[in-house]
Structure formats: structure tokens, C-alpha cells
Amino acid sequence: MLIDGKKIAAELRQEIKLEISQLKNKYKKVPGLTVILVGDLPASQIYVRNKEKSAIEVGLKSEIIKYPKSVTEEEILNKVEELNKDNTVSGILVQLPLPEHINKKKVIEAISPDKDVDGFHPMNVGNLSSGFKSSIPCTPLGCYHLIKKVEPNLDGKKAIIIGRSNLNGKPMAQLLLKENCTVTITHSKTKNLKKECMEGDIIVAAVGTVSYTHLRAHET
């Protein structure tokens, strides 16, 4: 089955745009997203620009705060604390990766859980696995929406997750468990990965490797 991701994304943006418009009318306030970007990695800059474009498109107030690669950890932590206290900022996103001299874990934990757009804060991770309301990492959430659009009822489906990262594989598994799927998480040490995949109704690949496993001839 081919899924038209662009069409589904456009529909979701319209739904979000309407929701934001309703929030504006109700609270007389424009929700705001602030992104902290450190360094000049081309991939990060493109990713952040796309986020800004999408945010503006749905009616969010968007701000990008840029720092050189030489910025200190203390400066980043101070800015995060400032944004935590700023009532005009609804969401905070620190673009990863960060330079090696900055402790990623420390920065993530400094973000207020209520403003943690990426869903990386330990409190949001715990809430997701416990079935409570939480922010959810965007990649697994996007995959979840795609799956639900083409198959609304997932009861009893066997889902195979390839990858066990905290950013993608694990939250993806939690989302599908909430939909009553039978979930198997596979990884680089899994024996006979192809066999596991062939038994699945749903396969989500969350690994940064091309042609990680072949399911059928000319397919991955």
C-alpha cells in the first residue's frame, strides 16, 4: 500500500490551523514556538527553517535563537530558564545535535516539561510509557498519524519496530501499545530479523541505515 504522506500532512496542518485559531479566539493569545539553534550544521539549519515555515503556516508565533558553536553550556541553560519563565513562549525546542562541550541531557532536563515540544524530558518519557498525557517526539508521532489514517482500528495488529532508540523506536512502541497492538521491538542484535518482519501487520523502521533488511525481492 502506498501512503500519500504529503496529502495527510496537509490535512493535519489544516486541522492544527483551525485548533490554533480557536485557541487565539478563546484566550486572546498567539501560541509561540522558540527554537534554539547552536552552530552551523547544514542539516540542522534546513530542519529548523522547515519547522519555522510550518509553524507560521498554521498560525504559530515562531522565533529562532541562534548561537555560535562556541557558546557555553551555561549560556544555553540560562536562555532555557529565561524561556521557561516567559509566558509568551508556549513551546521550546533545542535543535540537536549540540556541540560536544554541551551536555545534551542537562539541557533537555532544564526545559520545562510543559514546554518540551520534542517530548525528550524524562517526565514526558515517563508519562508516555505510563499512558498519561505527554509531549511526544515528532517522528514517531508522525508515523502514528500515518498509520491511523490508513488503518483506524489497530486492535490485535502485530507491529514490528526496527530500532530501540529513545527518540524513535521506544516511543513508537508505546503509541502502538496504546492502540492494542502486539508490539515487538527489534534491533541490531535481533536474530532472524526478516522472519520477525514477515510476521508483522505493521512494520516501522527507525534506523539510520539504508537497506537494513530485505523483506521481499527488491523491497526493504
What function would you assign to each model-found segment?
Residues L93-L154, M172, S211:
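Anion-binding alpha/beta catalytic cores of soluble intermediary-metabolism enzymes, centered on
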Residues M1-N25:
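Positively charged, low-complexity intrinsically disordered leader regions
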Residues A55-Y67, V183:
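Short beta-strand elements in bilobed, periplasmic/extracellular small-molecule ligand-binding domains
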Residues G39, E63-E73, S188-K189:
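Short beta->alpha junction loops
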Residues E75-D86:
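Short, well-structured alpha-helical segments in soluble
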Residues T213-T220:
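Conserved small/polar residues in nucleotide/adenosyl-binding loops
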Residues S44-N50, P137-Y212:
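Glycine-rich phosphate/diphosphate-binding loop of Rossmann-like nucleotide-binding domains
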